[in-house]
């Protein structure tokens, strides 16, 4: 199965892979046709930007314009794991990933196979494996049904927690939590007491 997954990614296809939150629909981020394929599969509006799934701090530095002092500590303390970090995008981030926004989100999923595929193929997009606007399937079989068996991937239901990732915005002078997930503000402060938080804005 792994060879089939790699072949699908290589040719610009999309595959279902587990993360620590939910299953994602992964494809090569720097391949415009592959990203377009994911948008069409998910029926996702084109103005909804995508995150870059990366494998290291070096990848984050390679695609971001600003690197605040707390970035390295956040990566060391919480990644790989359920944290999305938003930074200013540099000109290496293609417009088809971040919809021409000035920022881009970074994820580093902790599933070992998913992370290894990111290392092998470079940055991948990986939005939740569902039809846009519908609930995400909680099992691999449900996801296959959602996509009429037209996708392949790796089944590992036991790895998923179903909890959201926390989204933290480092693109401004103050740090904002845009969505509270399994990593809390208190968790972050315990590791990085000096982090310059702004007022918390929870997206429910």
Labelled PLM ranges:
Residues 1-204:
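Active-site-adjacent structural elements in enzyme catalytic cores
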